Amino acid sequence: MQNRTGLILCALALLMGFLMVCLGAFFISWGSIFDCQGSLIAAYLLLPLGFVILLSGIFWSNYRQVTESKGVLRHMLRQHLAHGALPVATVDRPDFYPPAYEESLEVEKQSCPAEREASGIPPPLYTETGLEFQDGNDSHPEAPPSYRESIAGLVVTAISEDAQRRGQEC
């Protein structure tokens, strides 16, 4: 019976808080239309009071849920403690898996200096656009056009495109 009464009071607090906030907002909008000073005073009293009641109802319902579920959690905790220490499951790494991260770092530290000394050859040259091998002798096959040549080419293409558009319109 006490559980049901608490539930009803909690729901009533939530409902009353919500209704008081709504009523306060209504009085504020009504007071701005009709210039009634009494409704504004009531609105400014109802809004904070409604928020306080609404928040207290929210916290009250949360408190009730926690206290109800606390009994269930205590029961589950007692069951687990009665069984003793829980076994810890571990996974053994078979030999065919790659080494762990820490082990691979140790191998790299040992092998890298020896490789650098042995090779002594710089890496091959690559182009900017792809990973194709580029011959060292033919690094710049042709010089880029000058600024005047590139602008002249743009003007010629713009004029030809404009002429094509005019021809299509006719």
From Swiss-Prot:
Keywords: Membrane, Transmembrane, Transmembrane helix. GO terms for cellular component: membrane. The keyword Transmembrane helix applies. Residues 112-147 are annotated as: Disordered. Pfam families: TMEM252 (PF15664). Disulfide bonds: none annotated. It is a multi-pass membrane protein. InterPro entries: TMEM252. The chain crosses the membrane at residues 8-28, 40-60. The keyword Membrane applies. Its main location: membrane. It is found in: Membrane. This is Transmembrane protein 252. It comes from Homo sapiens (Human).
